[in-house]
Curated annotation (Swiss-Prot):
<keyword id="KW-0961">Cell wall biogenesis/degradation</keyword>
<dbReference type="Pfam" id="PF02875">
    <property type="entry name" value="Mur_ligase_C"/>
</dbReference>
<dbReference type="GO" id="GO:0005737">
    <property type="term" value="C:cytoplasm"/>
</dbReference>
<keyword id="KW-0436">Ligase</keyword>
<dbReference type="InterPro" id="IPR005758">
    <property type="entry name" value="UDP-N-AcMur_Ala_ligase_MurC"/>
</dbReference>
<dbReference type="GO" id="GO:0051301">
    <property type="term" value="P:cell division"/>
</dbReference>
<dbReference type="GO" id="GO:0008360">
    <property type="term" value="P:regulation of cell shape"/>
</dbReference>
<keyword id="KW-0067">ATP-binding</keyword>
<keyword id="KW-0573">Peptidoglycan synthesis</keyword>
<dbReference type="InterPro" id="IPR004101">
    <property type="entry name" value="Mur_ligase_C"/>
</dbReference>
<dbReference type="GO" id="GO:0005524">
    <property type="term" value="F:ATP binding"/>
</dbReference>
<dbReference type="InterPro" id="IPR036615">
    <property type="entry name" value="Mur_ligase_C_dom_sf"/>
</dbReference>
<keyword id="KW-0133">Cell shape</keyword>
<keyword id="KW-0131">Cell cycle</keyword>
<dbReference type="GO" id="GO:0071555">
    <property type="term" value="P:cell wall organization"/>
</dbReference>
<dbReference type="Pfam" id="PF01225">
    <property type="entry name" value="Mur_ligase"/>
</dbReference>
<keyword id="KW-0963">Cytoplasm</keyword>
Length: 474
C-alpha cells in the first residue's frame, strides 16, 4: 500500500497498551457507567488487551450484556463496595461528582481517570486518526473502518456506535494504527494525540460546556491544528493550516462529489480529486441521505491521504454495512417502514426527515424522544419549526429520566407550541401498544415511521412497537 507523506509501514506491531500505567495489568480497572456507548468500547479494548476490567452501571443494556458475555464483571447499581479491589477508577463527564463510587475512590486515594485520560493513554505512541464533529462522526468513523477492513490496514477501532459489521463499538487490531471517534461534547477531542484529525461538521450544540458558538469553533480549530494533518468540510468556517489540510464538499474543496444518485438503499456518486482525478461510480451501501455522502467524502479523504487505492476505497464503501440506530430499518410491514435514528439536534432531525422524504411520497411520522431539557431550551424554536415538517409527531418523555426539568421545556410545552402554530397532528405517548395501534390505524403502504432519539427508551419502544404492529398487520 502506497503511503502519502506518512510512513505507516515502519510502525511496530504492538502487544501492549497503556504504556504509562502498565503496572496495573495485574490489578483492576473499574469503569463507572460501563454500559455507555463510549465507555463500553474502552472496556472491551482493555479487556481484549489482557487488562482486568470491571464496571458498574445504573441499569443493564445491550452493551452491558455484550461485555458480560466477554467475561467482564458488571455491577448493576452504584455501590462503594464495587470498587474495593480496583486500583484505577474511570469515569466520564456524565457521572456526577457525588457518585458514591467516585466519592469512595477519592476518599481512598485511588487513581481516578476521566474517560479522555484513559483514552489518551490508550493512544500514546500510536498512529492515530481521530474523527470528531457535531454530527456524522460515528458514521464517518464506521466508513473509514470499512475501507480499512477492505485494504491492508489492521487498525484498532473505537467508535460511538455499534458497527453492524463488528456487532460492537470496538475492534482490537494488530498494528499501532488507531481509528477513533473523538467526542466533542466535553472537550475530549482536545486530549487526543492525533496524527490525522477529521471534522465532519460544526454546529451550535453543547453550549452548556462551551458557552458560545465562537468557543465551539475555537475548540475545533485547536483540534485540527495540533495534528500533523487535518481533513475538514469546505464550509466549516474555522482557522486552519491550508498547507497541512484537505477539504471535502459538494461545491469546492479537494475532494468533491458529483452525479449523486439516491437508490433504494444505497447512494451512487463520482468523486473528483484535486480537479484532475476521478473515482467513478462509487456505491455507498446501506445509506440514505445527502448527509451520508458528506460522511463518505470525509472517509475517502482519509483513505486518499493514506494512499489507499481507488479499488479498495470503492470496495470498502460498497461493503459498508452501516451503524445501528443510524437510519436503521427495524421493520417493513406491508410497505410501512419503521426506521430508527439517533438524531437529537435539530439539524440532525432535519437531515433524517429529509432522507426519509427522499425515498417516499407517503407520509413521514416522527416518534421523537427529546434529549435533555437544556437542549430543548437552547433550540426550542428550531425544534418546533422542524417538527412541523413531519406529517405527524408523537412525543415521548425527555431522556434521560433523571434529567432535571426546566420550566417551559417539557414535551407538553413542545406540543402546546406546535398546536399554537397551527400544527395539530401531535400526541404525547410512551406506550408501545398505544403507538402500535395509532400507526396501524394511521399508515398506508409507502409511509415511513421514524423513531428518533439518542436514549435507550426510544430504542426499546421502537422494537416493542414493531413487534406489536407485525401482530396487528398480519
Amino acid at each position: 500500500m502506497r503511503i502519502l507523506n506518512y510512513t505507516i509501514i515502519n510502525l511496530v506491531m504492538s502487544k501492549h497498551l497503556l504504556l504509562n500505567i502498565n503496572k496495573t495489568q495485574k490489578g483492576i480497572i473499574h469503569i463507572i457507567g460501563i454500559g455507555g456507548i463510549g465507555m463500553s468500547a474502552i472496556a472491551e479494548i482493555l479487556h481484549n488487551s489482557n487488562y482486568k476490567v470491571q464496571g458498574s452501571d445504573a441499569q443493564s443494556n445491550n452493551n452491558v450484556d455484550r461485555l458480560q458475555k466477554l467475561g467482564i464483571e458488571v455491577y448493576i447499581g452504584h455501590n462503594a463496595n464495587n470498587i474495593s479491589q480496583a486500583q484505577i477508577v474511570v469515569h466520564s463527564s456524565a457521572i456526577e461528582s457525588d457518585n458514591v463510587e467516585l466519592v469512595t475512590a477519592r476518599n481512598n486515594n485511588k487513581t481516578i481517570l476521566h474517560r479522555s485520560d484513559i483514552l489518551a493513554e490508550l493512544l500514546r505512541d500510536k498512529y492515530v486518526i481521530a474523527v470528531s464533529g457535531s454530527s456524522g462522526k460515528t458514521t464517518t468513523t464506521a466508513m473509514i473502518a470499512s475501507i480499512f477492513d477492505h485494504s491492508n490496514i489492521d487498525a484498532t477501532v473505537i467508535v460511538g456506535g455499534i458497527l453492524n459489521s463488528y456487532q460492537s463499538n470496538s475492534r482490537l487490531g494488530k498494528s499501532d494504527i488507531f481509528l477513533i471517534e473523538a467526542d466533542e461534547s466535553d472537550g475530549t477531542m482536545l486530549k487526543i494525540p492525533a496524527n490525522i484529525t477529521v471534522i465532519t461538521s460544526i454546529n451550535d450544540d453543547h453550549m452548556d460546556h462551551y458557552g458560545t458558538f465562537d468557543d465551539i469553533k475555537h475548540a475545533f480549530s485547536q483540534f485540527i491544528n495540533k495534528a500533523d494533518f487535518a481533513i475538514l468540510p469546505d464550509s466549516v468556517g474555522i482557522n486552519y493550516d491550508a498547507s497541512n489540510s484537505m477539504m471535502f464538499g459538494f461545491e469546492s474543496g479537494n475532494i468533491r462529489a458529483s452525479n449523486i444518485k439516491q437508490h433504494a438503499n444505497s447512494i451512487e456518486f463520482d468523486v473528483l480529486i484535486d480537479n484532475n482525478h476521478r473515482i467513478k461510480n462509487v456505491v455507498l451501501s446501506n445509506t440514505i441521505g445527502m448527509h451520508k455522502v458528506s460522511n463518505a467524502l470525509a472517509a475517502i479523504s482519509v483513505a486518499i491521504k493514506l494512499g489507499i487505492s481507488d479499488a479498495e476505497i470503492k470496495k470498502g464503501l460498497l461493503e459498508f454495512q452501516g451503524v445501528a440506530r443510524r437510519f436503521s430499518l427495524i421493520a417493513d410491514i406491508k410497505g410501512v417502514k419503521l426506521i430508527e435514528d439517533y438524531a437529537h439536534h435539530p439539524n440532525e432531525i432535519y437531515a433524517t426527515l429529509t432522507a426519509a422524504r427522499s425515498i417516499t411520497k407517503g407520509k413521514v411520522i416522527g416518534i421523537i424522544e427529546p434529549l435533555r431539557f437544556a437542549r430543548i431550551r437552547n433550540f426550542f424554536d428550531e425544534f418546533i419549526r422542524i417538527f412541523m415538517m413531519f406529517d405527524y409527531v408523537i412525543l415521548t418523555p425527555v431522556h434521560p429520566p433523571e434529567d432535571k426539568p426546566i420550566p417551559g421545556c417539557g414535551i407538553d410545552d413542545i406540543q402546546k407550541a406546535l398546536i399554537s402554530n397551527g400544527f395539530n397532528n401531535t400526541k404525547i405517548m410512551n406506550d408501545a401498544l398505544l403507538i402500535s395501534h395509532f400507526i396501524s390505524d394511521s399508515t398506508s403502504p409507502s409511509d415511513i415511521v421514524l423513531f428518533i432519539g439518542a436514549g435507550s427508551n426510544i430504542a426499546k419502544l421502537a422494537k416493542e412497537t414493531a413487534a406489536l404492529i407485525a401482530e396487528v398487520k398480519v
